[in-house]
């Protein structure tokens, strides 16, 4: 059959029809796809957007079960159902915020009938018609979506409702929802029911009502929407817990559940429901810390063992996921706990904040204004803390309790566990034959194998000792012996941090090599088989540092594996310390006392050759083989003898036994001293028969020598203030007696050679550099001269040049301080049979007080500040005169700040700061040992740039300092400056540091450590010893002069008798001549006989004998021969001439006269002569220092202006108002507290009461001073006057006391030469130095005589002006206000004294000038007030002072000079002390010269600034003065 050609076409048509129908369907589906739903339909369709998931979820939740109570278990529930219940419950709780009278909530849960009811009293919902919506309010808010009373965000509410959904969502997801509310106000009761998911509203019922308001919501959840059949056990348990939540978080509300009142009395009792039956690690109940911070915040804290846990509520909503409110509270606690943990876990595993948080369980109940959440489920509160509407600052009591509640202990236990885990990773649990990664190990061939217990690991001190051991292994073989070199001393693991142990390569290598495992107990023999080595042999030098290394290794094993010590796991290899040989005989000694015993028992010991072995490196390879061949003699085993061994090791290395260690060392020093006195030999360990050693013996007989030598190296002697290294340097310099400078590096080599210095030369070079430094905060008296860059205050001396480039030589003062005449009375030490430095030198003043001391030894540390040279000299003179020494304050050369006493041995050191204007301050001095660069980097930079925690405080700063002076000009906003003033500028800018002197420990003259309670105790001890040694010096000189006098007398008589022919020597035998001389009464050489009596010659012979036997024998024979008359018979023939005869007679007479003069002098007279000579040279040195400072400054004369401009840049501004350092009551109380803790013998002289009195006195003094200033005639004040004249308004920043200086400074025009005359005047003043506090006041006021040192003390200082003492001048320079406060006393008297008297010689002031000064003073006093730290910058000084007595430094009023003493305040000190004080004052006036004398800076600023800008006629004269004083300063 053929196919019709139309058929395909028909088929196509059908296909097209089908396509058209499909397109039509597609068009319909667009409408179906894009649909619009009502709000109600949307909620039902997408419930998870509103109430959370409507699917069953299984998770861990806190629930309440009848039989268990609140517990944390796995529950299966529908979050949406839980949420709609919660919304109604929170609404009920919210009503408490609207009506505080609300008192009851009743919750009914009926699972059988699927019925939930929540009833609350308190103000109900208004039963009134809404005029806009035309329906009653209850129906509106429960039956209409998007209605709420919470939409006004301007109203701050602390309720849970927020978005207008809550109750409506419950209505929508219920099959039946009934609202019943009654309002007494509107006298109606409203009731209405909604059904079918709020789809159908029932009839509204309105009834008259006259009872108490209430609201009741009853609903039946639409379980089908939640895919549930009934309210199961889990969801009910969750709902019940929420009822308990409301009972705990809502105050004063009773909650009933199914008719029963819940037994919850408040948040605290609610928290207990969680912690019931919970125990901590020790089995005790958890401690709960509770605090009701305020009416909106309540916090509880306890320990958590399951990571961080929190139970928190915001406006009664349970925020199960926490939020910002929990973080806000937790972070406060964590911050404090982290600090505590870090302190208790020093060096352990680093602990971070989140790790601390993991041990906390926190409960927070908060009311927060308008809280925000990350979802409608309200589980996580997201509002920023700044918007909370309240703060929660936990009290110190809460924090303290939190620290003690067990959390810290829990964290520390966790830290230990973590540390142990980390340490165990470093150990290998498997024994290996080969070890990789330790290149310097020469492993024993059998190590780690079957015979590993027979292997010994030799640990050597350094690579050179390893070479020696390897040489010796050629004898014993390499199978059983391995060698590993240690790099110096290993860690004290008993006190090391976890990090140190983890990172310490030496310890990790030893563990790896030996195969040790932390926490493994090696009690039994089998456990030792797990080790790669069965023994460790320690091979170190036979010196004290070698002993220390042995001790540290013993400590390392004992601390981690004490059981190993019982197996004789440790042993040592000893080598000789001395070998003696004669012909082919050889003897070895292993301790010096044994060698000394041999010497004393061997008559001819001098004929033996002696070789000292300083370390293992001294031995040759041949000797190494000899040592190992005689292993029995050289191997000493450590034997465990019982608990006393454990106690001894712990004593030596435990941080907790510091006091026991002190007693241990004290007993040792006393025992050693007694043995010396009784002539007994020293104890020693290694005799010829020693084969083993107990740990107790090792610690108490060998290691103690290291501990003692550590103290000797670190703590100076009271006698000369030097440590052994410094003493060796001084000994070498005295011996070399260089007249020319020498390179530091070369001098270090010379010291090592001449004094047997056995340590690194680098430390020796640093010692030399430190002895020569003279910047502020270093030495008050440098014994060596710094010729080159020896460091400055910019970097605290760290900026010194390389020792190869700098030179030094003895200071001209050194031999005046350490007179050569005393050398014969000293006891010199011997090292390797070479005479080296003495046990101590005996200076004429206690150098330990002049230059201070600092050091940390074993059991003790020492810290003593510097004191003023002239004060000490004056006090020594007082002691010689039988008077009591005056109290002294620390003093640092050229320091211009103030030092005040807070309590006995407690001082506060203040820098200098002045206010230039409302936005600028000037810092012109930093506290002692606060270095300029460090201050800039650590204080000003963070203030300028801010940090993560603190915003910037200043806007800019400029630097104008030199290497000797400080000047920062700091800019800040007016508000910030005002706030800083209120807090205290010194405090804000960290310009105050404390100085505590409770550790004044020094070696006394017999070599025992002694703790001094006060500085005057040191002075008295030194005085008694020095006076005794002046007696010994006198005895020695009398003997020497007597012998020399007898020798000259014999020589003169011999020449005269020869001339007269009474003696004939020609052609006679020597023996006959000697007989004749003896018959005629001539003495055998008196000088030689006297020297031999002094045992000087034998000592020298003994030195030579050991080196050269023949010389020894020869010298012996000489000594043994009879009387010697060579001193007569060897005289040249020309002594018989008349000239020589007359000269000899003259010399004889002079020597006799010298002897008679010495006999008439007492030891005190000799001392006074030395002091006078020293002071004279000191003034010359200081004058030279001033001249050196002046070098390089702009020219004089016509160029003075330029010079002033330059100086003005580095000197303090004359316009500034000095800020008086504030000494607060808290500072004094803290100082007293420290004193009670640290000082056993308490000294109450500096009690706070006295300080307080002084503060009051200071205020009064300031007031008086300012009142008197206008008419005062004080020399210094006059200078101020010039300044004020210039400006008219302001006074020198250094008001009153400084003004005194200013007057001096005003003489800047005076050429430098004139400065010297002033100095002469100053000399007299220097006497007063002792009272640094009152220097100024004392000088000016004669009424305050008691305050300052008697004038007799001043004699040495010839340079000070009669009225101004050094210190007085210094204080002025540094701080006017300080001076004012302190010196106000003095300054008032100063003003009363005629200005001309002081200035005429120093400043060359004409009569009219003083008058001007007086007037200026008046204006100055008013205009240039010194600002107390708190006072306003621009107020008149008197007001500021009156207002803030606390800010004053505490100087007592003029009327109370004695009190001032007690309060004791150190004003700025100048390097030149009294001599230069006057000059410095002048120089301070000159700003440009500030660099010369730092102490002058402040004063100089005033004057200098004033002079250049003088505007008034008077000002011109002052300008001239300023220039002159400037030059003086330069001196």
Swiss-Prot record:
UniProt GO molecular function: ATP binding; ATP-dependent activity, acting on DNA; chromatin binding; DNA binding; DNA binding, bending; DNA topoisomerase type II (double strand cut, ATP-hydrolyzing) activity; magnesium ion binding; protein heterodimerization activity
Region: Interaction with DNA, residue numbers: 342-344, 990-999
Sequence ranges of Acidic residues compositional bias: 1099-1108, 1330-1349
Site keyed Transition state stabilizer: positions: 804
Site (Interaction with DNA): residue numbering on this chain: 489, 492, 661-662, 723, 757, 763, 931
Record region (Interaction with PLSCR1): 1433-1439
Cross-link named Glycyl lysine isopeptide (Lys-Gly) (interchain with G-Cter in SUMO2), sites: 17, 156-157, 261, 352, 386, 397, 416, 418, 425, 440, 466, 480, 529, 584, 599, 614, 622, 625, 632, 639, 655, 662, 676, 1075, 1114, 1196, 1204, 1228, 1240, 1259, 1276, 1283, 1286, 1363, 1367, 1373, 1385, 1422, 1442, 1454, 1459, 1484, 1492
GO cellular component terms, semicolon-separated: chromosome, centromeric region; condensed chromosome; cytoplasm; DNA topoisomerase type II (double strand cut, ATP-hydrolyzing) complex; male germ cell nucleus; nucleolus; nucleoplasm; nucleus
UniProt entry keywords in alphabetical sequence: Acetylation, ATP-binding, Biological rhythms, Cytoplasm, DNA-binding, Isomerase, Isopeptide bond, Magnesium, Metal-binding, Nucleotide-binding, Nucleus, Phosphoprotein, Topoisomerase, Ubl conjugation
Residues modified to N6-acetyllysine: 1422, 1442
Post-translational modification Phosphoserine, affected residues: 4, 1106, 1213, 1247, 1295, 1297, 1299, 1302, 1332, 1337, 1351, 1354, 1374, 1377, 1387, 1391-1393, 1449, 1469, 1471, 1474, 1476, 1495, 1504, 1525
GO BP, sorted A to Z: apoptotic chromosome condensation; chromatin organization; chromosome segregation; DNA damage response; DNA topological change; embryonic cleavage; female meiotic nuclear division; hematopoietic progenitor cell differentiation
Catalytic reaction annotation: ATP-dependent breakage, passage and rejoining of double-stranded DNA
UniProt activity-regulation remark: Specifically inhibited by the intercalating agent amsacrine.
Comp. bias regions, Basic and acidic residues: 1256-1272, 1491-1502
Binding site for Mg(2+) 2: 541, 543
Domain of life: Eukaryota
Residue spans of biased composition, Low complexity class: 1406-1431
Entry binding sites for ATP: 91, 120, 148-150, 161-168, 376-378
EC number(s) recorded for this UniProt protein: 5.6.2.2
Tissue: Expressed in the tonsil, spleen, lymph node, thymus, skin, pancreas, testis, colon, kidney, liver, brain and lung. Also found in high-grade lymphomas, squamous cell lung tumors and seminomas.
PANTHER family, sorted: DNA TOPOISOMERASE 2-ALPHA, DNA TOPOISOMERASE/GYRASE
Protein role: Key decatenating enzyme that alters DNA topology by binding to two double-stranded DNA molecules, generating a double-stranded break in one of the strands, passing the intact strand through the broken strand, and religating the broken strand. May play a role in regulating the period length of BMAL1 transcriptional oscillation.
Description of how the protein assembles with itself and partners: Homodimer. Interacts with COPS5. Interacts with RECQL5; this stimulates DNA decatenation. Interacts with SETMAR; stimulates the topoisomerase activity. Interacts with DHX9; this interaction occurs in a E2 enzyme UBE2I- and RNA-dependent manner, negatively regulates DHX9-mediated double-stranded DNA and RNA duplex helicase activity and stimulates TOP2A-mediated supercoiled DNA relaxation activity. Interacts with HNRNPU (via C-terminus); this interaction protects the topoisomerase TOP2A from degradation and positively regulates the relaxation of supercoiled DNA in a RNA-dependent manner.
Protein name in the entry: DNA topoisomerase 2-alpha
């Amino acid at each position: 059959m053929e196919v019709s050609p139309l058929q395909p076409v028909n088929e196509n048509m059908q296909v097209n029809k089908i396509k058209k129908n499909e397109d039509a369907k597609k068009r319909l589906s667009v409408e179906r796809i894009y649909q619009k739903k009502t709000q109600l339909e949307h909620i039902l369709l997408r419930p998870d957007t509103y109430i959370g998931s409507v699917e069953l979820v299984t998770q861990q939740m806190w629930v309440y079960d009848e039989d268990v109570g609140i517990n944390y278990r796995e529950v299966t529930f529908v979050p949406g159902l839980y949420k709609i219940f919660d919304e109604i419950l929170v609404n009920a709780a919210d009503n408490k915020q609207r009506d505080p009278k609300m008192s009851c909530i009743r919750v009914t849960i009926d699972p059988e009938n699927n019925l939930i009811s929540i009833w609350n009293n308190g103000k109900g919902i208004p039963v009134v018609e809404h005029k806009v919506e035309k329906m009653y309010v209850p129906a509106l808010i429960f039956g209409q979506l998007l209605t709420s009373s919470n939409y006004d965000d301007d109203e701050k509410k602390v309720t849970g409702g927020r978005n207008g959904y809550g109750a409506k969502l419950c209505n929508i997801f219920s099959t039946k929802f009934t609202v019943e509310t009654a309002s007494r106000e509107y006298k109606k009761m409203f009731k209405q029911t909604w059904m079918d998911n709020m789809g159908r509203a029932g009839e509204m019922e309105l009834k008259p009502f006259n009872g108490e308001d209430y609201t009741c919501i009853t609903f039946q959840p639409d379980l089908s929407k939640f895919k549930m059949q009934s309210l199961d056990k889990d969801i009910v348990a969750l709902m019940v817990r929420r009822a308990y939540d409301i009972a705990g978080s809502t105050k004063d509300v009773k909650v009933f559940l199914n008719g029963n009142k819940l037994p919850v009395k408040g948040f605290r009792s609610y928290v207990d429901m969680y912690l019931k039956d919970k125990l901590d690690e020790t089995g005790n109940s958890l401690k709960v810390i509770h605090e009701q911070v305020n009416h909106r915040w309540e916090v509880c804290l306890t320990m958590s063992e399951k990571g961080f846990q929190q139970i928190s509520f915001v406006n009664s909503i349970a925020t199960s996921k926490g939020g910002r409110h929990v973080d806000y509270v937790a972070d406060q606690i964590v911050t404090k706990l982290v600090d505590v943990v870090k302190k208790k876990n020093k060096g352990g595993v680093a602990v971070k904040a989140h790790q601390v948080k993991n041990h906390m369980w926190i409960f927070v109940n908060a009311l927060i204004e308008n809280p925000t959440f990350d979802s409608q489920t309200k589980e996580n509160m997201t509002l920023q803390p700044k918007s909370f509407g309240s703060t929660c600052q936990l009290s110190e009591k809460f924090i303290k309790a939190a620290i003690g509640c067990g959390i810290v202990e829990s964290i520390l236990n966790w830290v230990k566990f973590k540390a142990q885990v980390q340490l165990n990773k470093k150990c290998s649990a498997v024994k290996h034959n080969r070890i990789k990664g330790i290149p310097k190990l020469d492993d024993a061939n059998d190590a780690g194998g079957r015979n590993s217990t027979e292997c010994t690991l030799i640990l050597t001190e350094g690579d050179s000792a390893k070479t020696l051991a390897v040489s010796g292994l050629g004898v014993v073989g390499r199978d059983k012996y391995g060698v590993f070199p240690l790099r110096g001393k290993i860690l004290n693991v008993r006190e090391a941090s976890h990090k140190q142990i983890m990172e310490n390569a030496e310890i990790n290598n030893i563990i790896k090599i030996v195969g040790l495992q932390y926490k493994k107990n090696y009690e039994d023999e089998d456990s030792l088989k797990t080790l790669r080595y069965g023994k460790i042999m320690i091979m170190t030098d036979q010196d004290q540092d070698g002993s220390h290394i042995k001790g540290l290794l013993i400590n390392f094993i004992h601390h981690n594996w004490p059981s190993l010590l019982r197996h004789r796991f440790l042993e040592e290899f000893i080598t000789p310390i001395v070998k003696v040989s004669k012909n082919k005989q050889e003897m070895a000694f292993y301790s010096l006392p044994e060698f000394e015993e041999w010497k004393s028992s061997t008559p001819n010991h001098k004929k033996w050759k002696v070789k000292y072995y300083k370390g293992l490196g001294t031995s040759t390879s041949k000797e190494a083989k000899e040592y190992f061949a005689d292993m029995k003699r050289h191997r000493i085993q450590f034997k465990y003898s019982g608990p006393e061994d454990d106690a001894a090791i712990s004593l030596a290395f435990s941080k907790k036994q510091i006091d026991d260690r002190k007693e241990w060392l004290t007993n040792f020093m006393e025992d050693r001293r007694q043995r010396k006195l009784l002539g007994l030999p020293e104890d020693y360990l290694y005799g010829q028969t020693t084969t083993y050693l107990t740990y107790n013996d090792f610690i108490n007989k060998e290691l103690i020598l290291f501990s003692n030598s550590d103290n000797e190296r670190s703590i100076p002697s009271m006698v000369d203030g030097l440590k052994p290294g410094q003493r060796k340097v001084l000994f070498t310099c005295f011996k070399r007696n260089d007249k020319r400078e020498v390179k530091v590096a070369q001098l270090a080599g010379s010291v090592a050679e001449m004094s047997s210095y056995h340590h690194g030369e680098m430390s020796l070079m640093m010692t030399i550099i430190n002895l020569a430094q003279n910047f502020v905060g270093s030495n008050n008296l440098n014994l060596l001269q710094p010729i080159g860059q020896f460091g400055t205050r910019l970097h605290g001396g760290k900026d010194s040049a390389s020792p190869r480039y700098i030179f030094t030589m003895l200071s001209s003062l050194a031999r005046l301080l350490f007179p050569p005449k005393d050398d014969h009375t000293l006891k010199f030490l011997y090292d390797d049979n070479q005479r080296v430095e003495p046990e101590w030198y005996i200076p004429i003043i206690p150098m330990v007080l002049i230059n201070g001391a600092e050091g940390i030894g074993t059991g003790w540390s020492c810290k003593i500040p510097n004191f003023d040279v002239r004060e000490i000299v004056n006090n020594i003179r007082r002691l010689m005169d039988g008077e009591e020494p005056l109290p002294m304050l620390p003093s640092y050369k050229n320091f211009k700040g103030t030092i005040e006493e807070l309590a006995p041995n407690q001082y506060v050191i203040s820098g200098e700061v002045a206010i230039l204007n409302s936005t600028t301050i000037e810092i012109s001095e930093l506290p002692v040992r606060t270095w300029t660069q460090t201050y800039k980097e650590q204080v000003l930079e963070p203030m300028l740039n801010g940090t993560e925690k603190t915003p910037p405080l200043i806007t800019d700063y400029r630097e104008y300092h030199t290497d000797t002076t400080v000047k920062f000009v700091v800019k800040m906003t007016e508000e910030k400056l005002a706030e800083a003033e209120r807090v205290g500028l010194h405090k804000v800018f960290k310009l105050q540091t404390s100085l505590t002197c409770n550790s004044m420990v020094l070696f006394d003259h017999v070599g025992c450590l002694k703790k001094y309670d006060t500085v005057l105790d040191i002075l008295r001890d030194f005085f008694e010893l020095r006076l005794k040694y002046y007696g010994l010096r006198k005895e020695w000189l009398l003997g020497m002069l007597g012998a020399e006098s007898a020798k000259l007398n014999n020589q003169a008589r011999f020449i005269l008798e020869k001339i007269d022919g009474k003696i004939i020597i020609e052609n006679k035998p020597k023996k006959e001549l000697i007989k004749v001389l003896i018959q005629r009464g001539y003495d055998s050489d008196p000088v030689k006989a006297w020297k031999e009596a002094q045992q000087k010659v034998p000592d020298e012979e003994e030195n030579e004998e050991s080196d050269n036997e023949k010389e020894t024998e020869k010298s012996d024979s000489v000594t043994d021969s009879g009387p010697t008359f060579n001193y007569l018979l060897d005289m040249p023939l020309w002594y018989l001439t008349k000239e020589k005869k007359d000269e000899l007679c003259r010399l004889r007479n002079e020597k006799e006269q010298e002897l008679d003069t010495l006999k008439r002098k007492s030891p005190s007279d000799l001392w006074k002569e030395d002091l006078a000579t020293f002071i004279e040279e000191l003034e010359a040195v200081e004058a030279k220092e001033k001249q050196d400072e002046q070098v390089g400054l702009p020219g004089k004369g016509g160029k003075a202006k330029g010079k002033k401009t330059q100086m003005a840049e580095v000197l303090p501004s004359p316009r500034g108002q000095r800020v008086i350092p504030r000494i607060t009551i808290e500072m004094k109380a803290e100082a007293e507290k420290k004193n009670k803790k640290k000082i056993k013998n308490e000294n109450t002289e500096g009690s706070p009461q006295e300080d307080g009195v002084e503060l009051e006195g200071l205020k009064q003094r300031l007031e008086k001073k300012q009142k008197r200033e206008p008419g005062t005639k004080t020399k210094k004040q006059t200078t101020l006057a010039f300044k004020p004249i210039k400006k008219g308004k302001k006074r020198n920043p250094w008001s009153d006391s400084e003004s005194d200086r200013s007057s001096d400074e005003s003489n800047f025009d005076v050429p430098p030469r004139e400065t010297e005359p002033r100095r002469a005047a100053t000399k007299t003043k220097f006497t007063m130095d002792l009272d640094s506090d009152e220097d100024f006041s004392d000088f000016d006021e004669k009424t305050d005589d008691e305050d300052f040192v008697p004038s007799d003390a001043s004699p040495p200082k010839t340079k000070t002006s009669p009225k101004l003492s050094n210190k007085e001048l210094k204080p002025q320079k540094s701080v006017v206000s300080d001076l004012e406060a302190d010196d106000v006393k003095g300054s008032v008297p100063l003003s009363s004294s005629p200005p001309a008297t002081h200035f005429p010689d120093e400043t060359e002031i004409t009569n009219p000038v003083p008058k001007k000064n007086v007037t200026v003073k008046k204006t100055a006093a008013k205009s240039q007030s010194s600002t107390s730290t708190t006072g306003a910058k621009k107020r008149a000084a008197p007001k500021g002072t009156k207002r803030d007595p606390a800010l004053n430094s505490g100087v007592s009023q003029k009327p109370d000079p004695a009190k001032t003493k007690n309060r004791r305040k150190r004003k700025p000190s100048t390097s030149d002390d009294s001599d230069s004080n006057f000059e410095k004052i002048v120089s301070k006036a000159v700003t440009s010269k500030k660099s010369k004398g730092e102490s002058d800076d402040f004063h100089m600023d005033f004057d200098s600034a004033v002079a250049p800008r003088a505007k008034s006629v008077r000002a011109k004269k002052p300008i001239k003065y300023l220039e002159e004083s400037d030059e003086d300063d330069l001196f």
